[in-house]
């Protein structure tokens, strides 16, 4: 879906269930949406990946690749548009009613948050926070993971103000 904001064409290239990890169960970098995002060559790139990596098929087995895979993703966008501004987001919250919340997901989510903060520092990209603005409002995550329209508006505002 495409829209225009302050002279920018805004396009979404998300893939439901996609992982940042290239060895994950649905690697984003192997999806059509990734190729489309590179072809779009945006002036501003917002990356919010990692929530699906909390899957027990992924993080416990491949966590050691997360930072390198994220750096490769960032570098891909820099090749597509060397002048692009890249923002990477701290993960949206996972509500405690999520079925795997206490069986590893909560801890893995925290580990991924720390990895994203490390990546922002070393890849010299801007870190934005998708966690704090939604954390007080679990009702904006009706399935415990994905924001509803109101939650999406909060995230859009976060990006706009960055």
Predicted regions and their residues:
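Conserved SGNH/GDSL esterase-like catalytic core that processes O-acyl groups on lipids
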Residues: 1-71, 110
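Proline-centered loop/turn at the N-terminus of a beta-strand
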Residues: 9, 84-87, 126
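Solvent-exposed loop/turn segments at secondary-structure junctions
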Residues: 15-21, 51-56, 92-96, 132-136, ...
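Active-site segments of SGNH/GDSL-like serine hydrolases
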Residues: 48-54, 74-110
